[in-house]
């Protein structure tokens, strides 16, 4: 074979190789009627040593330092984002802007069948970091509860890899969650009637470390959600789901990163609020304004401030008590301010 013929043969062989590689990696932009999959970086699985952790993010602009913390704990492995709607916009940001990962992958689970798909489940289970994007938490409860996706999320936590969520993704991380099944609810309406249909709560979805007996809420100060969080807590204890319940309210552009010992550190702008119930509410009935006195509140405001979730205590920040009296909130702070 002369040189020219040899070169043509090599080029043809390379063409076949490229074509076969493209076929093998078709799921890189998988598009079915049950899920969509997108990736930046290496689509093949790698295994990296990880460290456990949680990222609880309050919505709006993401907190870069919290994602970098997750990436560090991922060991530079595969960073997987799951959601029920939206786009793959996290992928280029994580892979190119933040860097330090083998891949950034987004799985959009469109239907319950997608939450049982072996490809989807393998991608989640093999993640070195897993993040639940914002959206509508009812989609997550409706599509994922009782499925292999729920089991896969628990598996990632159990193997000691970091797991996080923002906004709706934050809402489903606690033992208890506000599902928004009937739509959202504002504080004044929740306080006015704790048993109205929009106060839709769930107690049997995810079970993550240090979030037992906890319900979370996001966009906290920006959307005035203290009243509804107090109402959620009242319902949880009044309905017998827990003898004592705890709430974590996280403001926008703010995150808590939680290490393997349960120490939560504030990243971003703050503040974050930690609430704890004192017992049963005085009045928590259908079509009757809530009366619930003396909930313990702890506020962290400064980046780097810490709270021990295992002991539910801190040497930093501000402590006060909060009460609902016939649907109206007040506190022991100067002027009675609830935040």
Residue ranges and their predicted role:
Residues 27-76, 86, 90, 98, ...:
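C-terminal and late-domain segments of enzyme folds
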Residues 123, 146-160:
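Catalytic-core regions built around general acid/base machinery
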Residues 10-21:
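Bacterial N-terminal signal peptides
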Residues 137-147:
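Glycine/threonine-rich flexible loop motifs
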Residues 56, 129-133:
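Structural motif
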Residues 1-11:
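Bacterial N-terminal signal peptides that target proteins for export
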Residues 86-126:
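Portal/gating segments that form or line small-molecule/metal binding sites
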Residues 133-134, 156-177:
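Catalytic nucleophile loop
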């Amino acid at each position: 074979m002369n040189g020219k013929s040899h070169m043509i043969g090599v080029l043809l062989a390379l063409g076949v190789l490229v074509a076969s590689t493209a076929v093998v990696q078709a799921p890189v932009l998988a598009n079915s009627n049950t899920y969509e999959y997108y990736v930046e970086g290496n689509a093949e699985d790698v295994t990296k040593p990880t460290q456990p952790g949680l990222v609880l993010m309050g919505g709006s602009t993401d907190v870069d330092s919290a994602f970098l913390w997750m990436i560090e704990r991922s060991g530079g492995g595969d960073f997987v984002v799951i959601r029920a709607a939206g786009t793959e916009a996290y992928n280029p940001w994580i892979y190119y802007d933040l860097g330090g990962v083998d891949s950034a992958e987004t799985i959009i689970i469109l239907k319950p069948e997608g939450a049982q798909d072996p490809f989807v489940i393998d991608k989640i289970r093999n993640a070195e970091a897993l993040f639940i994007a914002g959206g509508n938490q009812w989609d997550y409860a409706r599509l994922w509860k009782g499925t292999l996706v729920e089991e896969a999320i628990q598996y990632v936590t159990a193997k000691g890899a970091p797991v996080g969520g923002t906004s709706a993704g934050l809402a489903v991380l606690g033992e208890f969650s506000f599902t928004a099944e009937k739509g959202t609810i504002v504080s004044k309406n929740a306080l006015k009637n704790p048993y109205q249909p929009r106060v839709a709560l769930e107690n049997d979805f995810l079970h993550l470390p240090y979030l037992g007996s906890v319900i979370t809420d996001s966009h906290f100060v920006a959307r005035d959600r203290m009243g509804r969080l107090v109402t959620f807590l009242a319902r949880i204890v009044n309905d017998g789901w827990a003898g004592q319940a705890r709430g974590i309210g996280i403001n926008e552009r703010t995150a808590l990163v939680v290490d393997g010992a349960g120490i939560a550190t504030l990243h971003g702008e703050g503040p974050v609020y930690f609430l704890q119930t004192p017992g049963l509410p005085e009045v928590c009935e259908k079509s009757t304004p809530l009366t619930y006195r003396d909930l313990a509140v702890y506020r962290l405001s400064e980046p780097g401030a810490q709270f021990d979730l295992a002991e539910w205590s801190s040497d930093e920040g501000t402590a006060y008590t909060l009460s609902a009296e016939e649907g109206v909130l007040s506190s022991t702070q100067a002027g009675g301010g609830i935040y």
